[in-house]
């Protein structure tokens, strides 16, 4: 081989090496990501052992980034669409789903874990989001308050407008509260586009109390909450609130001190999705699979007080005995909610608080 030929060969090898190096750098240095980031709301909770189980099984560090309530999380994700802060978003519910899908936040992924999930919970046929849990927002009432006065607790939304229930109800503002919005949607679903406004006029005339959020409504104003000095025996809360009252009271009561008006319940489903532009899409798929696993699903009830969607997951005894799963909850299509939510909240504000 001539000296010139050797120089050419050396140059070609060097060029090839440089091209390979550049290609490798463009692909993130050829190193697999070592963590997966979950973007979620402030109410997300899980046991330490469950988090450690995922990290042990996947070989990844699971970082949890909490960013406000569900609405704030979705808004922030939309602002960073395509260049997300995390790999998976958990907490978008059916009230926010159409907004998130229209914003092209997610990439499709059909998890094998969906084989254990009823079709009832799957609202996106393209599997851009995966159902993880469900809960119902319902009227709760203080059993002792009604028993002491010989008054039957309300059995329907209509009952709340009757004279005997005057000044007994506290609700959350739908402009500032997730359960407050769900209750407004329940009245839209029950009375229709032409009737819900009159229903709220009747509630206002009957002395409904409106507060900003669930914390004040339930723990301060509602008479049935443990330690509360409230004087309102009816509140908008959750179907899982009665078992929570049993669990957190000392000593534990034999029966739940609060009840649920089943005909008032509005269904909420929470979803998780892989964010478009995720830095660790492979890890994101593993995390979605884990969120559907029995290990995580059975941790949900006592951590976040909602229900698992995996039909094979076992409920804790407190949920089996005291929780309510209404057979026919009120619902609205996500697309209908997205198209009308702001207008409905504005109308509600004019009718109820102005």
Where would I find each of the regions flagged by the language model?
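Early extracytoplasmic/lumenal segment of secretory-pathway proteins
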Residues: 27-99, 220, 354
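Short, low-complexity disordered leader/linker segments with a strong preference
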Residues: 1-36
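Short beta-strand->loop
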Residues: 106-115, 129-130, 158-161, 233, ...
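Mature extracytoplasmic/periplasmic domains
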Residues: 272-331
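A structural signal for short loop-to-beta-strand junctions that line the ligand-binding cleft
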Residues: 84-89, 107-144, 158, 167-174
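Periplasmic solute-binding protein
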Residues: 94-105, 124-152, 180-190, 269-273
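Ligand-binding pocket segment of bilobal, Venus flytrap-like solute-binding proteins
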Residues: 182-263
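Extracellular/periplasmic bilobal clamshell ligand-binding domains
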Residues: 317-354
């Amino acid at each position: 081989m001539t000296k010139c030929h050797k120089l050419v060969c050396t140059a070609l090898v060097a060029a090839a090496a440089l091209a390979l190096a550049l290609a490798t750098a463009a692909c993130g240095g050829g190193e697999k990501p070592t963590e997966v980031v979950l973007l979620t709301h402030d109410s997300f909770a899980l046991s330490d052992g469950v988090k450690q189980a995922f990290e042990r099984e996947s070989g990844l560090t699971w970082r949890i980034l909490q960013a406000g309530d569900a609405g704030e999380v979705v808004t922030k994700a939309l602002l960073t669409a395509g260049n997300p802060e995390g790999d998976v978003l958990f907490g978008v519910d059916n009230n926010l789903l159409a907004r998130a899908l229209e914003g092209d936040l997610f990439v499709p992924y059909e998890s094998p874990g969906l084989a254990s999930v009823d079709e009832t919970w799957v609202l996106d046929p393209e599997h851009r989001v995966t159902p993880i849990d469900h809960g119902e927002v319902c009227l709760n009432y203080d059993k002792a308050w009604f028993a002491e006065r010989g008054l039957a607790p309300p059995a329907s939304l209509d009952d709340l407008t009757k004279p005997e229930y005057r000044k007994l109800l506290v609700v959350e503002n739908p402009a500032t509260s997730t359960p407050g919005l769900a209750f407004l949607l329940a009245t839209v679903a029950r009375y229709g586009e032409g009737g819900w406004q009159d229903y709220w006029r009747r509630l206002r005339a009957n002395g409904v109390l409106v507060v900003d959020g669930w914390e004040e409504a339930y723990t301060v104003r509602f008479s049935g909450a443990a330690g509360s000095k409230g004087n309102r025996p009816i509140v908008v809360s959750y179907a899982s609130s009665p078992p929570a009252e049993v669990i957190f009271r000392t000593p534990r009561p034999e029966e739940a001190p609060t009840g649920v008006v089943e005909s008032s319940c509005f269904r909420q489903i929470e979803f998780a999705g892989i964010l478009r532009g995720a830095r660790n899409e492979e890890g994101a798929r593993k995390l979605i699979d884990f969120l559907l696993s029995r290990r995580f699903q059975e941790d949900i009830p006592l951590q976040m007080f909602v229900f698992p969607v995996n039909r094979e997951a076992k409920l804790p005894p407190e949920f089996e005995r005291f929780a309510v799963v209404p057979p026919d909850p009120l619902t609205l299509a996500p697309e209908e909610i997205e198209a009308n939510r702001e207008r409905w909240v504005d109308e509600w504000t004019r009718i109820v608080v102005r």
